[in-house]
Regions:
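Extended alpha-helical scaffold segments
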Residues: 650-789
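Acidic, His- and aromatic-enriched active-site or binding-groove loops in soluble protein domains
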Residues: 90-103, 107-108, 132, 144, ...
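CE4/NodB-like, metal-dependent polysaccharide N-deacetylase domain
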Residues: 127-151, 243-256
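Eukaryote-specific, cytoplasm-facing alpha-helical/coiled-coil scaffolding segments in long proteins
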Residues: 442-452, 472-477, 569-571, 699, ...
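Short, well-structured secondary-structure segments
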Residues: 3-8, 13-125, 129-130, 147-151, ...
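Conserved short loop/turn motifs at secondary-structure junctions
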Residues: 116, 145-156, 260-264, 434-439
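Extended, Lys/Arg-enriched charged tracts that mediate electrostatic binding to polyanionic substrates
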Residues: 63, 81-85, 177-179, 183-197, ...
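Active-site and substrate-binding clefts of carbohydrate-active enzymes
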Residues: 1-55, 76, 190-508, 534, ...
Length: 789
């Protein structure tokens, strides 16, 4: 029998600020908030509902690719997805449930080492915790025990395999170059095969402990071709390439490939459609069966055994040197650069990690019955910060001292969590120590160092920076890792005073902000007083925050002084650092007297911490900018409308005698007509006559408003109409309204994005079955949205 298994490794490096657990706006991901959001739209979401097209490029099916392949998602990525893309997250979980029914009880999903640490380079305890956390995270999300765990970069050694076997993992997926030699079970002679290993079978690996684990080696050349050639340019080509690999033998053959999951849609646009078509084609091929590794292993246990190449991986020719040395592996995009910084960076991290181990063992012994057991179980609190979960955790692990001082106990565990996050593999993968991935892992180191300082009073940062100074940058103005840390990491630190002030500014700029939540903190009390004058605003008072992560609680006094639209002075001080009543009275006196410069100077002197707006999280700055722009838009709209209404009759007269239309008027006209069209399409019922009149004006003035905001508004309306149809597909009026809207969109040349509308209508028509083919209006609707009936 012939089998096919396609594995997708879905992972993104963590991008959250180490203090806030939130991702800052990333302009390079525009028009999305950040790269996670962009990649989700391009890959994770489309693969949950992938399109299959016929020869006419009409839609014939929508199916979850996840439900028919083997896959893993990084736990840190799933954590983000659960909060920010809940529909996609649920689709991933549901796909695994569906796949268990398809593949004999074996789900397509497998676990992953928690934060993509290179396990052969990790110390023994980190190996264990990374595997335990990855498994526990999987169990919590998928509701079952995983059969396997994906190793970051497939980096492997015998010690790592022992940890996997200890945790009951049945198999591991490796690159063919990671195979050292094979032999038939029961035979004595080994065959040195290396990368020439036959990838069409499972292999048994006998470990020194006496335990065993199965090995699958993916097809290297085909996997590489899929990732870096045009194989995915069509589903037919993809399927043909995979189906051409089988030989004529009668034994079970497993064609298996493994690539980054982001290949399907992000790295290669529309590749999720090629994957969907390929899977459908394979399902229709009589002698080939889709499978996942767990099912194949159960049906066809290994008859060969294999040994691995120690300290090997899929992305470094030199084993695992890419994550600790200047081995020559890099992106290839910066000829002449070196990676001599990799070794010193790892040494710097190892140095602070070892000091934090001492802290954890000495101080931790006062707070936990067994600190390392507590760390292994800390994943339960990471996944559930509720009071009930904390109570259960403390019942199991806490000493009496921990019960009386929970914040310190939790800070110890958070220190260890960040001390592992700082080894995320992406920090070494690329070319330069100032790259965002490397800055990110330094940020985790900074957070861990800060927690160690709070717990012990000992500051590890000077020694860490001294070690980082030995890590050379390729950029002259940066020189070394210490300069990178100083420039890019330190400004990202978020003391609780700054978190409080950012929350106050957010509330002033955006009424939709949750007043009870400031990033990872609860707002227990917020008692502001506000004073306003033309061009000035002063907000001051008390605020109390409590960290959900560490339970650390802080009451603070604050003042936010605003001059003009976007000039903010923000200051805060812990309770007890000032005579609050005297300070607040002085602020009131100065502001009431119009002594605004003195008011600002007094704030700088009276409060412990001062922060300009420019130092704050970019999302907060954007809230202020958005508020300013909204006010500007309102004023602009009013002025442009006055200009348009007053001058349009004159302009029409000028056109009649062949005179050119003044450019300033055209600017005003485009603004006004765009706003009016948006308003029409966002109304509950579109007034077609009004749209026709507006478009006549657009045509008369030679404007083009078919793109941008108007197109977006048309797309929104189309999607809403399609959703209404999907909820009640037998309602002829819904179908008619949708067809008429599509006709008008064609007439006016709006070209809306039909992706979501097509999905809704497809499922609506599918619910009607054969009846959909019998009604003219439904056939017309299908034609308009290119859906095959």
């Amino acid at each position: 029998m012939k089998y096919l298994c396609i594995h997708g490794h879905f992972y993104q490096p963590p991008r959250e600020n180490a203090w806030l657990e939130e991702i800052e706006i990333q302009d390079s991901a525009f028009p999305f908030h950040d790269w996670n959001s962009r990649i989700s739209a391009e890959c994770y979401s489309p693969n949950a509902l992938a399109r299959v097209l016929d020869g006419n490029k009409d839609l014939i099916d929508l199916a979850s690719n996840y439900a028919r392949i083997s896959f893993n998602f990084g736990p840190t990525l799933l954590s983000w997805m659960e909060k920010r893309e809940p529909e996609v997250y649920q689709a991933v979980l549901e796909a695994d449930r569906v796949s268990r029914g398809r593949f004999g009880g074996h789900g397509g999903a497998i676990a992953q080492a928690y934060n993509h640490m290179i396990l052969p380079l990790a110390n023994a305890r980190d190996k264990v915790t990374q595997v335990k956390w990855g498994i526990r995270d999987f169990e919590k999300r998928f509701g079952r025990r995983p059969e396997a765990l994906w190793l970051a970069e497939t980096a492997c050694n015998t010690e790592t395999l022992e940890v996997l076997a200890d945790e009951g993992m049945k198999f591991v997926i490796l690159a063919p170059g990671q195979c050292k030699r094979v032999r038939k079970i029961g035979e004595e002679k080994w065959q040195e095969v290396g990368a020439g290993v036959d990838p069409k079978r499972a292999y048994l690996c006998n470990l020194p402990s006496g335990k065993q684990i199965a090995l699958f080696f993916y097809d290297g050349p085909i996997s590489q071709g899929i990732a870096f050639s045009d194989t995915l340019s069509s589903g037919e080509k993809f399927a043909s390439r995979l189906l051409s690999t089988y030989n004529s033998g009668e034994e079970a053959q497993l064609m298996n490939i493994a690539t980054d999951g982001e290949t399907y849609g992000h790295h290669q646009k529309f590749a999720e459609m090629a994957l969907a078509y390929c899977l459908k084609k394979v399902e229709e091929t009589p002698d080939v069966e889709l499978t996942v590794y767990g099912e194949f292993l159960a049906k066809h246990p290994p008859v060969y055994e294999a040994q691995i190449v120690e300290n090997s991986s899929w992305s470094c020719f030199h084993g695992v040197e890419r994550w600790r040395a200047d081995c020559g592996c890099n992106s290839g995009m910066k000829p002449g650069w070196n990676q001599k910084w990799r070794g010193p960076l790892r040494s710097a991290l190892d140095g602070v990690r070892d000091e934090m181990i001492k802290t954890f063992e000495s101080v931790g012994a006062q707070y936990f019955k067994n600190p390392w057991d507590a760390r292994n179980d800390y994943i339960d609190l990471i996944l559930d910060r509720s009071l009930d979960a904390q109570h259960k955790f403390f019942l199991k692990h806490a000493t009496e001292k921990a019960w009386n001082d929970r914040p310190t106990a939790l800070m110890l565990l958070e220190m260890q969590r960040n001390a592992m996050l700082m080894y995320t593999s992406c920090g070494w993968f690329f070319d330069e120590i100032s790259g965002i991935e490397t800055v990110q892992i330094m940020q985790y180191a900074a957070r861990a160092i800060e927690l160690n300082r709070v717990i012990t009073g000992v500051d590890l940062e000077p020694g860490f920076m001294e070690a980082l100074a030995l890590a050379p940058s390729n950029l002259k103005d940066l020189k070394n890792g210490a300069a990178v840390y100083e420039r890019y990491v330190k400004p990202q630190a978020m003391p609780i005073e700054k978190i409080a002030l950012e929350h106050v500014v957010s509330l002033l700029a955006d009424e939709t902000v949750n007043p009870k939540k400031a990033y990872e903190c609860e707002v227990l009390a917020y008692e502001p007083k506000k004073l306003t004058a033309p061009g000035f605003h002063l907000s001051y008072g008390d605020i109390t925050l409590k960290s959900v992560t560490t339970l650390l609680e802080r009451r603070m006094h604050f003042a936010v002084f605003q001059r003009g639209a976007a000039e903010f002075l923000c200051a805060a001080g812990a309770e007890g650092t000032m005579d609050k009543n005297a300070v607040f009275a002085k602020l009131e006196e100065l502001f009431a007297a119009g002594k605004y410069d003195e008011c600002a100077s007094f704030i700088r002197q009276a409060f412990e911490k001062n922060y300009p707006l420019v130092s704050m999280f970019q999302d907060v700055r954007r809230k202020v900018v958005d508020l300013v722009l909204r006010k500007m838009d309102e004023e602009t709209d009013k002025k442009f409308t006055e200009v348009f209404e007053a001058q349009y009759p004159v302009v029409r007269g000028l056109q009649l005698i062949g005179a050119p239309v003044p450019k300033p008027f055209l600017t005003a006209a485009e603004f006004v007509l765009t706003a009016d069209l948006k308003a029409e399409f966002r109304a509950a019922d579109v007034d077609v006559n009004a749209v026709e009149e507006l478009m006549e004006d657009v045509k008369t003035l030679g404007l083009d408003v078919s793109k941008g905001p108007v197109r977006d508004a048309v797309t929104e309306k189309l999607t809403l109409l399609a959703f209404a149809f999907a909820r009640n597909p037998s309602d002829k009026a819904c179908a008619l309204k949708l067809v008429e809207f599509l006709n008008y969109a064609d007439i006016f040349g709006f070209e809306p994005d039909t992706v979501k509308a097509q999905e809704f209508v497809f499922f609506g028509l599918k619910a009607l079955g054969e009846d959909a083919k019998k009604k003219d209006i439904l056939r017309a609707l299908a034609r308009k949205l290119k859906i095959a009936l």
